[in-house]
Amino acid sequence: MTTESMPESTNDYQPQSIEAAIQHVWDEQQVFVAKEDDSKEKFYCLSMFPYPSGKLHMGHVRNYTIGDVVSRFQRMQGKNVLQPMGWDAFGLPAENAAMDNQVAPAKWTYQNIDYMRNQLKRLGLGYDWTREVATCHPEYYRWEQWLFTRLMEKGLVYRKLSVVNWDPVDQTVLANEQVIDGKGWRSGVPVERKEIAQWFLRITDYAEELLTDLDQLEGWPEQVKTMQKNWIGKSTGLEIEFPIASGLDESNGSLKVYTTRPDTLMGVTYVAVAADHPWARKASVNNEPLERFIEECSHISTAEADMETMEKKGVDTGIRVKHPITGDEVPVWAANFVLMGYGTGAVMSVPAHDQRDYEFAKAYDLPIKAVIAPKAGEEADVSEAAFTEKGVLVNSGQFDGLKSKQALHEMAKVLGELGLGEKQTNYRLRDWGISRQRYWGCPIPVIYCPACGALPVPEKDLPVRLPEDVVPDGSGSPLAKLDSFKKCECPQCGGPANRETDTFDTFFESSWYHARYTSRHEDNAMLDKAAADHWLPVDQYIGGIEHAILHLLYARFFHKLMRDEGLVSSDEPFKNLLTQGMVLAGSWFTQDEKGKQTWYSPLDVDPVTDDKGAIVKGTLKSDGTEVQYGGIIKMSKSKNNGIDPQTLIDQYGADTLRLYIMFASPPEQTLEWSDSAVEGAHRFLNRVWRQVQTHVSTGVVAACTSNDDLTKEQKALRLKLHTTLQKVTDDMGRRMHFNTAIAATMELLNDISRFKDESDAGRSVMQEALEMLVLMLSPMTPHASQALWEALGHDGLVLNVTWPTVDDAALVKDEIEIMVQVNGKLRGKIEVAAEADKDTILAAAKANEQAAKFIDGKDIVKEIVVPGRLVNIVVKG
């Protein structure tokens, strides 16, 4: 460094003054501003950017501390590091806060950004703030609008009717999570399913590439790749047609279904269609029960999770179709578990071999016909549940005896000859619906002209700016009611036209921010290709496992869209992925007679434990009221068990919080909060501080660089030091197990504390040990490490110091410990010179006081020496 603003070194560790001074120096010298530099290996470290909700929580702190530690470590490896930060600023919470507080979402968002930016700086996070983005800024979202218009021209965007959750009171579309027990979360009235026109991106055009390119991602957790594979859901099966038998005119064609289990075709006893399937609607005319059922289904959530758990219901439509092979009539039922938006909106139902079909058949007394047996000559037991495994076909006529796998080919052949079926590869993945009937989002750049139709907004007119002074009232779309936004001129014919009043799904913004960071100041293009290609792909991406599917899949998709637009050269956005675990804490509540729960902060409760130390209950510190223990659960506002990071920074300093976060658990595992462990981290930093201050109080010396002329004790400390350095380097660089790296430094400090040698050589060894300890801790505790680095006599920034290298000579032991066994049992230990020969080792073993008790007066039958490890003396008598 040095700087006048640094506080003078003191024997007392005073984190607040130290941290403020050092952060000032970082800002003043712009040490984290990254520039393209081909002379160094680049390292782009990115943590998922936050939604500016108002305050950082411990989940944020963990995510961002991990990223900062990785960045600082890689910088000390000599790499050119980029670590940016920004804000995922659009979204529903801002609208809700606006309605609650009568303030424009823009104002609320920008205030939160300012506050949270300061919190991030207080944590000592080394971000390049010159690259900061906020997705609600027009200079950011103009480029996603531009990309949308390019995709529109390429045919990768289309508009179609789609079913949504509609709140009839608020006159607005609800996200699935806003539907509570079938009712709107604000209005409390039953929601309706409604078809409205929405925009979609053809992500299915990239389904195969998104699937196969997962194999490139060797630095991703297998769990995440498996989740994405399952979400994409590639399958091979048959599309089968069931011709109309009765109940509808034959002009309606056949009912098409897709199945991955054609081996069960001969066990079909009914076909189920979605309640809003065209056939069901036609059949509902003059069919009151069916009409009522369709109306009932229009009020249930479209969320897949809800569909899985709800009671399965249905009504016979009266329509009959012909089994494609037997010609038997099969009833068509309208069922609430079939969605029109998935596949053909119809499924063939085989109760004997599908549990959902089985339960439905039992409920409505439909036939159950087993056509798969576990093995030839056996029968499947379907008396209590469906047999869902594959096996051998039975009761299947010409297909009897075939194995399930063989049946796919045989069924395809027969159905192909009949013109009623063909092999098909399907994907579970659906095109991405990107329209949101929200105000606080990026406007979709489309103009509707009565004469010319839907047109992209011309590039010269971008961005389509979102008015920032609107305060939503929760009813309808604010933009649709705002003529100053909605009314416009057709870019093609010049006539009166209307703007699209929907906004993009907020996943749109977070799908390309990683790329925009590389070109933050590029005003004339979405990306500066040279800069993007310099930094991309991201070398280390860090975020929660909850983003394993949607965000990470959409970001991969967007990266490929940008590649195909010539904006980037890489196929994938993120080379390595670390998914950090959640932060957990104890929880406490009371419950009234109506079952309503009130949650209390752990800071306000005194736990009561049983004789084994297990928590059984608690009492409020304020008045002694008894409270129930809710267990260790995720920190959350709703459970009132979060810990405010700011409080801990004020009390202990940022370095203590950072050190605790990195030490408490491996990054990919959950972290269980412990106040006492935070205090322990603070005590450790104080010990390091005092150790350095004690050493430098009599002056600094040159650090030791070799084992020449050192005593046994001095060599032992150097051995411990370089063994620790070897472990810490591997733990932090390759394994990313920061907790074990920190544990190793704690062990090292214990050895340093025990080393009492004020000779010149001893002080030189101590200087080396303390310097390396400070360097090893510096990624976790950058402020204290900077101050201690200066105290040890160094100028400049510790984060620019090259990571120390292991002295292999220090790892060589002059003496080694040998186990002494007698008749295979451990009887003693000896220390001998590392180069001692067999005779010397045996002599020392026999002279060992403990071992001699079992050897003296007995005949030695055999002597075994395993070099460097043990001696075994076999005796008898």
Curated annotation (Swiss-Prot):
It holds the Pfam family tRNA-synt_1g. Its main location: cytoplasm. One of its GO terms (biological process) is leucyl-tRNA aminoacylation. The keyword NAD does not apply. A motif ('KMSKS' region) lies at residues 634-638. It catalyses: tRNA(Leu) + L-leucine + ATP = L-leucyl-tRNA(Leu) + AMP + diphosphate. A motif ('HIGH' region) lies at residues 50-60. GO terms for molecular function: aminoacyl-tRNA deacylase activity; ATP binding; leucine-tRNA ligase activity. InterPro entries: aa-tRNA-synth_I_CS (IPR001412), aa-tRNA-synth_Ia (IPR002300), Leu-tRNA-ligase (IPR002302), Leu_tRNA-synth_edit (IPR025709), M/V/L/I-tRNA-synth_anticd-bd (IPR013155), Methionyl/Leucyl_tRNA_Synth (IPR015413), Rossmann-like_a/b/a_fold (IPR014729), tRNAsynth_Ia_anticodon-bd (IPR009080). Gene3D superfamilies: 2.20.28.290, 3.10.20.590, HUPs, Isoleucyl-tRNA Synthetase, Domain 1, Valyl/Leucyl/Isoleucyl-tRNA synthetase, editing domain. Keywords: Aminoacyl-tRNA synthetase, ATP-binding, Cytoplasm, Ligase, Nucleotide-binding, Protein biosynthesis. ATP binds at residue 637. It comes from the Bacteria. Its EC number is 6.1.1.4. GO terms for cellular component: cytosol. PROSITE patterns: AA_TRNA_LIGASE_I (PS00178). It is found in: Cytoplasm. Belongs to the class-I aminoacyl-tRNA synthetase family. HAMAP family: Leu_tRNA_synth_B (MF_00049_B). PANTHER family: LEUCINE--TRNA LIGASE, MITOCHONDRIAL (PTHR43740:SF2), LEUCYL-TRNA SYNTHETASE (PTHR43740). This is Leucine--tRNA ligase. It comes from Hydrogenovibrio crunogenus (strain DSM 25203 / XCL-2). The gene is leuS.
